[in-house]
């Protein structure tokens, strides 16, 4: 799979590798959040996660209806939740969590350096320095990861935990520890 990445990026369009990557992870991941850009493919990914290798312990397959392959703070996100071989579906409305934004352009990324700086800014300033869209996307998706990891019993509590970790500076401290460990 490592050799397919550069070719996939060079193609510039989604390919079968976008679907196979999360399913063929050699680490045997049992808990994960998987974003799918094409809504029609999401049930297939969820079904495969439910069946592969005994099935995912807990996974969320997500599709933001604005065309995002992640949980979107703009409009509804469709969710396929996989637990112990079973798939259930639900809709996630960011307004329910006070994290809805109206302008999708506010989520637009840049080059890797700009994107990294944006994340660092979000982690360094719990108020997000005016980047409400970035903070909403971060909390919605981090909340899903915390929930799927089994740290909290509900998605709502996952968002609350993510918010607390960002607000206290613990998220930034964890990033700094990771960098030191990696020698970066």
Located regions from the model:
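Glycine-rich anion-binding loops and their surrounding alpha/beta cores
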Residues: 1-184
